[in-house]
UniProtKB/Swiss-Prot annotation:
Belongs to the binding-protein-dependent transport system permease family. CysTW subfamily. NCBIfam families: 3a0106s02 (TIGR00969), permease_CysT (TIGR02139). It is found in: Plastid, Chloroplast membrane. Part of the ABC transporter complex cysAWTP (TC 3.A.1.6.1) involved in sulfate/thiosulfate import. Probably responsible for the translocation of the substrate across the membrane. Pfam families: BPD_transp_1 (PF00528). It is a multi-pass membrane protein. InterPro entries: CysT_permease, MetI-like, MetI-like_sf, Sulph_transpt2. It comes from Chlorokybus atmophyticus. This is Probable sulfate transport system permease protein cysT. GO terms for cellular component: chloroplast membrane; plasma membrane. Keywords: Chloroplast, Membrane, Plastid, Sulfate transport, Transmembrane, Transmembrane helix, Transport.
């Protein structure tokens, strides 16, 4: 083969390699661009706006008594809602995957109702059902428990909107678990509970953590249903998202931005912490 032919072949190889690289890279570039403009840029803009007030009013506004009260109410009710959803989410996901019964498809479809229902409609529905004269609210009222327009109502709204995250995260994992492992454990004399904790629960742990984290994050940011089912009185049941909207209505953009930055920081901290725990769990499994 002559020198000219070899050089021409090298140029063709480089051209083909470049073309292949461009073909592979455009989906990656499109993905990065979409994530940057839809997710990263808004967060940067919020943090940038808040940083302008960092040495002026940031800590003063972020640590206002009413703001701290909303952080406590938001986090405590979201934590309570997440614990409830985590417990019942595992049970319901297990029942939907492992058992066949009449109406199963209807129940499975109903799990996604909070995704499809506008949050304002959800809040109106919950306020009606759990009010003192509502179908469920009057039962609690008879034993001295007021649900609507209290922190309990806030927790109920958070439970409603965040529940599907736990169930939908667990279902695919439960489907993949080989039932022969359970049968082997039973044949070796393991009880039902021992089989669950030693055979089923370990592979479910990452999915449970993910589902619970998503539910908690969703509960923290809930506004549409909470603003209707709560009284929104400061130091009683006012949540941080509602306070942010109240500040915007008062044209207090600085206060809304700072409080929003605090909630965003809490969410990011939880997100990174959970990802770190999951990475440690994967290393342990390997």
């Amino acid at each position: 083969m002559s020198t000219n032919e070899m050089n021409q072949k090298k140029r063709l190889n480089r051209s083909g390699s470049l073309s292949s690289h461009l073909t592979r890279s455009w989906p990656w570039q499109l993905t990065l661009s979409y994530l940057f403009f839809m997710l990263i840029l808004p967060v940067i803009a919020l943090l940038s706006r808040a940083s302008d007030e960092l040495f002026k009013d940031f800590w003063q506004i972020a640590a206002e008594p009413v703001a701290i009260s909303t952080y406590v109410v938001t986090l405590m009710t979201a934590l309570f809602a997440t614990l409830i959803n985590g417990f019942f989410g595992v049970i319901i996901a297990w029942v939907l995957v492992r058992y066949n019964f009449p109406g199963k498809r209807i129940i499975d479809a109903a799990i996604d109702l909070p995704f499809a229902l506008p949050t304002s409609v959800a809040g109106l529905t919950l306020a009606t059902v759990y009010s003192d004269q509502g179908w469920i609210g009057h039962l609690f009222e008879s034993i001295g428990i007021k649900v609507a327009f209290t922190r309990v109502g806030v927790a109920v709204a958070m439970i409603f909107v965040s529940f599907p995250f736990v169930v939908r995260t667990l279902q695919p994992v439960l489907v993949e678990i080989d039932q022969e492992l359970e049968e082997a454990a039973w044949s070796l004399g393991a009880s039902t509970w021992r089989t669950f904790w030693r055979v089923i629960f370990p592979p479910l742990t990452p999915a449970i953590v993910t589902g619970v984290a998503l539910a908690f994050s969703r509960a923290i940011g809930e506004y549409g249903s909470v603003v209707i089912v709560a009284s929104n009185i400061p130091f009683k049941d006012l949540t941080a998202p509602v306070l942010i909207f109240q500040r915007l209505e008062q044209y207090d953009y600085t206060g809304a931005t700072i409080i929003g930055t605090v909630i965003l920081s809490i969410s990011l901290f939880l997100l990174f912490g959970i990802n770190f725990i999951q990475s440690l769990n994967q290393l342990y499994v390997k």
